[in-house]
Amino acid sequence: MKARLQISRRVAGLAVAAMLACLAAPPSGFAATVPALTVTLSPGAPDSRGDIPYLDVKIVADAVDATAGQPFLRLPLVSSNVQGIADALTGFRATDAKGPLKLTTHDDPADAPAGYRHWAADRTVLGPLVIEYRVPITNALNARGAAPPLELRTEEGGFSGSGGIFLVLPESTKLYRNAVRWNLAAAGPQAIGLSTLGAGDVTSSTPTSADALASTYFMGGNIHHFPDVLPAGGFSAVWQGEPPFDAHALMQWTQTLYGSYLKFFHAPASQPYAVFLRRNPVNAGGGVEIGHSFVGTFDKNTKTEDLKLTLAHEMVHTFVGALSGDDELGLSWYSEGLAVYYQRLLPLRAGVLSPAQYLADLNQTAARYYTDLLNDAPNDQISAKFWADTRIRVLPYDRGAMYFALLNSEIRKASGGKRSLDDLVLAMVERRWHGLPVDTAAWVKLVEHELGSRGKEEFEAMLAGKLVVPAPDSFGPCYTRTTAPLRRYELGFDSVVLTQPSRIVRGLVPGSAADRAGLRNGDIIVKPVPQDAIQADQKATLTFLIRRDGKEFPITYLPRGETVQAY
């Protein structure tokens, strides 16, 4: 999810800092030659509970042209396992230079890797095109289970969501001057708006695709913010609702850490970075990097220390990025593995994480990886099973981190301590800055330069599923490798159940903890539950709200199976 380089123009109720040089006005001729694509968001007035019930959307696209029957608009049916809201849109209407358009829709097949709803007109479409519709904000739980916090949610007069969930955008490769406008009159005099494009009304300073707006995150209404004056560049944060921790203090900590990241990655201090925080009733404490910013979540039990590591993790993504290629999940060993590796190392170097906290986080990764029954799954199975099984989903994170720890140790030894993993990562970052390929081939070439053919062989073995075991001294002189008896994670029934809207238990494992706790085939799991964090905690229990024979009741158990010796 990418989108950067923006101009900050205005934000209701806030003073906005002066424009920084990197966000200067568009170059001469830019406005005249590149068509505009403007999104205006108008949230409804909060109800008696403080919830914003709907969001009115207006999209104006210049220079649209499509023949009769040709799809020219689209909206994802599912985005990163988040159920889309195409069926919930109301008041949908579109007009072009000739007047109102009569539209028809068709959906991609349900098994399409990236399915959309497409709109077509009964006549030729000539821009400018104006689209208007209303999106309900229901706070409904994602029917598909585990997923990043992209869906529209509202609380205490604020709302947030990803453009990929609710923006109907031109189906075109054309470049636009993407712009965001906020109409916050109904939300109240103190309402503000922030997106990953910047604070308040913003216009992109370089031509970008319509898809960049789908990869934009929005939060608006009566929301909290840090610092007191939202800057046009650098660090900023907003959150909706009241977290169970001191959000200002946490954002001060994050701003300090962000400064150390800027130095490590040799990035300009003006590089914008925003943090969005909101409540998550299903998988609190997690988050997602989007538009070179971070969306984090919390609930009443979220601890500041845990969220710090999540923030540290997601900020790594902003600088490292992902490998280029079609199989995003299959390539995530790089981005997620590096994020886990550096989420504890960079804060330790910056002095904002203690050696004991570093060790605790390292052992959490190790325990989850070495007890994972599927830790020998080849990397080419990741994409197909990523959302269906938590044991597969965590492999790019855990196996990737252990691979990078092993690689760092070997590079240090081969170079007599003169080089490390840092040098390879910074070389990849520099390639990205210079527009050079940042792909698997580029990575393998760097590894071979350091370690010769052995480096390539170890890399290929990791992808093939061979267990990665760093040397005892891989994490420095203060730590060594030991073993301990730990139990494998065992859900106790078919994990695909948790990704399905009906969530009907099947494939119950006889004698498992789930079976002994009273779970039965045919039980309906009323609400989705997270597993990734529980899988990393040997003592964490699972609680399902079950519906059976018209009655609802909870079932709690420790989802653990056999004991194994783990590092």
Question: Which residues are covered by each model-predicted region?
Answer:
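Beta/coil-rich, acidic/histidine-enriched accessory regions frequently appended to metallopeptidases
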Residues: A32-L41, K58, A88, H434-Y567
